[in-house]
Amino acid sequence: RLDYSGHGRSSEAFTDGCIGDWAADAQAVITAVTDGSVVLVGSSMGGWISCLLSQRLPRVAGFVGIAAAPDFTEDGMWASFDDAQRKTLWDEGVLMLPSDYDAPYAVTRKIIEDGRNHLVLRAPLPMNFPVRLLQGSDDVDVLPQVAVALLNHIEGGDVRMVLVKGADHRFSSPDCLTLLERTVAEVAQIK
């Protein structure tokens, strides 16, 4: 498990990070602590990071995305901001947004600008290994349509999506966790 800077138990501030930094962090950890083939497993933003790493690391042998959120800074955040929010973000460098899970969170100009340098749905995305996308039907943070768009965009011969009725963004019910465990084991066994 990896907590990106500004996430989980890491010591850095979220507002100091961006997609490029987090992808570089993940790549450095994978390079330092693994040998041989790797299966990338990423949830939400981690799904986007996994898409990026799948193009950078030749050792990737599979990808399991859970509510994967590719290009969310552009297609989810920026696209949903009204003119006043965009102006605040650009002028002040930060925009505070409410969260359904926690205290309000900051969206920085840095994350929006950097995200534009790492978009994966606007160029070919070859994945010549097993890909499994797990998605909840009740996810309001990453809508099922995002998973379908990613499914259709990935170029590969073994790309599948499972939509779980009633599952939300956290995808953490006992049934969801069992499905996740089974899916990772399946992808890891495919050669």
Per-segment meaning from a language model:
Residues R1-S11:
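Conserved alpha/beta-hydrolase
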Residues D16-V33:
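Alpha/beta-hydrolase active-site loop
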Residues G42-G46, S50:
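Gly/Ala-rich beta-loop-alpha elbow adjacent to hydrolase catalytic centers
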Residues R56-V107:
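Hydrolase active-site cap/lid region
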Residues P126-M127, L133-Q135, D139:
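Short beta-strand/loop motif that positions the catalytic acidic residue
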Residues V140-V146, S172:
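Conserved alpha/beta-hydrolase "acid-adjacent" motif
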Residues I154-R170:
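Catalytic histidine neighborhood in serine/cysteine hydrolases
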Residues A167-L180:
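Catalytic histidine-centered segment of alpha/beta-hydrolase-like enzymes
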